[in-house]
């Protein structure tokens, strides 16, 4: 393994450790020494790759989005979507995204904290949020599903409105998941059940594409 490969591997290890520490303990309660310990490297090595804690927060946030995109793609690939109409593909993709609430709840709260933290450090513009990426690039499963629906006629709204709904769907679903993650389990808003609430929200978003 070349020296460059070792450095790349070490940097990735630091970012993975940072994401875990920030998600479990919160950004403010996490010290660089905690990240170094989690990653099995020295604190000095962490600073070799990242100048500030804010740089680590940024890279950890970008790692989470990259992982989210890959998970979404895998879910999309595992399901036989080709025979389904576009609107049903939209529904499945949104519900797959909503599943993050159950498997990455702490990470979702980290993202919420990270956006505020990076904003205070004038770095919020550096979040190249891959979810969602540009609609017309058709890279994300949701964009592919919408474009399929436009082509097969199951998406009834205009293409311009479909593009707006694409961004609004991701942002509103993320907001709901973060809100639910911050809500006590005995709150009245949680009575319908977490999965039921998310499923109904995804159904509601899907219906907007049919109008």
Language-model segment annotations:
Residues 2, 13, 17, 21-59, ...:
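Helix-turn-helix
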Residues 100-126, 178-185:
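Amphipathic alpha-helical segments used for helix-helix packing
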């Amino acid at each position: 393994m070349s020296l460059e490969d070792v450095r790349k591997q070490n940097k990735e290890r630091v970012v993975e450790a940072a994401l875990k520490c920030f998600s479990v303990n919160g950004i403010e309660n996490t010290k660089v020494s905690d990240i170094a310990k989690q990653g099995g490297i020295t604190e000095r090595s962490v600073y070799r790759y990242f100048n500030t804690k804010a740089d680590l927060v940024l890279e950890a946030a970008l790692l989470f989005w990259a992982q989210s995109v890959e998970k979404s793609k895998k879910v999309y690939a595992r399901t036989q979507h080709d025979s389904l109409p576009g609107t049903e593909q939209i529904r499945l993709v949104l519900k797959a995204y909503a599943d993050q609430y159950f498997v990455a709840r702490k990470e979702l709260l980290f993202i919420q904290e990270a956006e505020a933290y990076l904003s205070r450090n004038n770095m919020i513009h550096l979040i190249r949020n891959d979810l969602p990426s540009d609609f017309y690039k058709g890279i994300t499963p949701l964009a592919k599903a919408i474009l399929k629906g436009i082509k097969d006629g199951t998406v009834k709204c205009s293409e311009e409105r479909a593009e707006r709904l694409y961004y609004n769907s991701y942002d509103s679903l993320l907001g709901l998941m973060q809100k639910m993650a911050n809500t006590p389990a005995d709150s009245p808003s949680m009575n319908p059940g977490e999965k039921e609430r998310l499923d109904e929200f995804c159904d509601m978003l899907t219906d907007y594409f049919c109008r």
